[in-house]
């Protein structure tokens, strides 16, 4: 019992030290580097893309959307292998690893991993949790298979939800998120790398249309969501870095502990 109390005291000591060392001033807004500060102008491009993509959900634009997809559908892309299932991750992978090839990045590997994880979480939250689960929009391939042939009684949003979650394009969101991260990390000194990443992301969007998985407007909205997710991750990075630095400034000590009947070594770890 005494030994357990001693361990508890050590734990409480560690927690109290943590509370004393954690300083909220370390994540104060004035400490944010200029390149990471929020600016309303940075919302213009992703906002415009999302707004343009959203118009495809309304009747005046919907007719034009169907006409465009009709032309694409005649190319027969619905039977091709969807390699964009894998290519969508190439820009994000480049954002994390391009400096391993000698290209200077704005941040170290740990920061880039944290930036990518945050950006992906935000993008997925917007794209999947918020929109795909709540906006009913039939996929082009399903439209041509069932609706255009008069077989609408065979499918429904409740019974076949994956057939009706076309808006927005998740693949496009992932690809453009990665492309924007490449631009932010490397674009200042290596603009060609940003251009290449955006070219890959654009190719992913085009393939989603060609393969009858998405309408053109789905891709626009997905691109906007991806760019916005990357920029939110970029804005949050200084706060996350300082938060984790505060949490993981570890003090490790090994102390002898005795209760009269024996002695042990106790590890004290302060987060």
Features from the language model and the residues they span:
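N-terminal targeting leaders of membrane proteins
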Residues: 1, 8-104, 112-116, 132-134, ...
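Membrane-embedded catalytic cores of phosphoryl/pyrophosphoryl-handling enzymes
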Residues: 145-259, 264, 268-269
């Amino acid at each position: 019992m005494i030994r357990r109390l001693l361990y508890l005291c050590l734990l409480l000591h560690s927690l109290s030290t943590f509370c004393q060392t954690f300083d909220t001033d370390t994540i104060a807004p004035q400490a944010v580097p200029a390149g990471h500060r929020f600016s309303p102008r940075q919302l213009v491009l992703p906002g415009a893309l999302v707004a343009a993509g959203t118009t495809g959900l309304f009747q005046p634009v919907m007719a034009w959307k169907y006409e465009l997809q009709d032309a694409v559908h005649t190319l027969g892309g619905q039977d091709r292998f969807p390699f964009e299932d894998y290519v969508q991750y190439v820009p994000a992978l480049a954002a994390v690893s391009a400096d391993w090839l000698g290209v200077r990045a704005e941040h170290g590997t740990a920061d880039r991993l944290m930036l990518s994880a945050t950006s992906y979480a935000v993008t997925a939250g917007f794209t999947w949790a918020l929109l795909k689960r709540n906006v009913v929009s039939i996929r082009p391939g399903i439209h041509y298979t069932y609706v255009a042939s008069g077989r609408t009684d065979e499918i429904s949003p409740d019974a076949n939800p994956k057939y009706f979650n076309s808006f927005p394009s998740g693949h496009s969101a992932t690809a453009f998120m990665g492309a924007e991260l490449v631009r932010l990390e490397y674009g200042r000194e290596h603009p060609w790398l940003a251009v290449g990443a955006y070219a890959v992301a654009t190719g992913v969007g085009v393939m989603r249309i060609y393969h009858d998985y998405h309408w053109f407007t789905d891709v626009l909205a997905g691109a906007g969501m991806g760019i916005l997710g990357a920029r939110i991750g970029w804005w949050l990075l200084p706060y996350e870095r300082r938060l984790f630095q505060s949490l993981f400034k570890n003090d490790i000590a090994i102390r002898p502990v005795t209760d009269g009947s024996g002695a042990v070594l106790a590890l004290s770890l302060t987060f």
